[in-house]
């Protein structure tokens, strides 16, 4: 791994089409995050087939332009990802949800998460969105990152989700105004 790989976040790009190789790499990132204890909608152990099925559905949403998918890649491959859920109800065309911000453990503490969030915010702004919302484990690294990036904490919901090991966890909702 070069000094550039260690010291700076890798470049972020938006995928408009997802290849089989990218599906496999995204699955690896998801499995690594769940193995590491991230509460991202899946229980441990997460099978490769379940992870792949999830990403195939995401790829379908990208193809239908219901989702925007961003990835961070280093010299080895995809190390992080985030999504914008663009397909909102008729009375909410101005907003999108930020979802599944995942960073492989080998790439953490390098600014990858922040770079992914900023890229998604910029794309949402360019798409005319003025409000983003998300949820995160209340006391987790992601919640601290969102607060540092200027997202407004709405508040926690006790026992909203489960950690991958089955333990209940509180979830905090955040929002970010893009027109301010």
What positions do the PLM features span?
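Terminal substrate-recognition subdomain of acyl/acetyltransferases
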Residues: 2-11, 15-18, 152, 163-180
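Acetyl-CoA-dependent GNAT
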Residues: 10, 14-100, 104, 117-119, ...
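Active-site acidic-Proline motif in GNAT/NAT acetyltransferases
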Residues: 104-106, 110
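Conserved GNAT acetyl-CoA-binding A-motif
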Residues: 117, 124-137
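Conserved catalytic-core motifs of GNAT/GCN5-like acyltransferases
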Residues: 131-137, 152-169
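Conserved active-site tyrosine of GNAT-family acetyltransferases
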Residues: 146, 151
């Amino acid at each position: 791994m070069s000094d550039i790989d260690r010291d700076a976040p890798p470049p972020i790009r938006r995928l408009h089409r997802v290849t089989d190789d990218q599906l496999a790499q995204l699955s690896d990132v998801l499995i690594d995050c769940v193995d590491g204890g991230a509460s991202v909608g899946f229980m441990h152990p997460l099978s490769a087939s379940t992870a792949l099925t999830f990403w195939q559905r995401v790829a379908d949403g990208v193809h239908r332009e219901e989702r925007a998918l961003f990835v961070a890649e280093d010299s080895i491959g995809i190390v992080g990802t985030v999504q914008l859920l663009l397909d909102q109800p008729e009375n909410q065309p101005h907003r999108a949800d930020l979802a599944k911000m995942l960073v492989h453990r080998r790439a953490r503490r390098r600014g990858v998460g922040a770079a992914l969030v900023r890229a998604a915010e910029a794309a949402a702004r360019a798409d005319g969105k003025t409000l983003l919302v998300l949820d995160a484990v209340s006391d987790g690294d992601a919640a601290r990152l969102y607060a540092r990036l200027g997202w407004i904490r709405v508040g926690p919901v006790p026992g909203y989700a489960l950690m991958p090991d089955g333990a209940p966890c509180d979830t905090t909702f955040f929002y970010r105004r893009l027109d301010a």
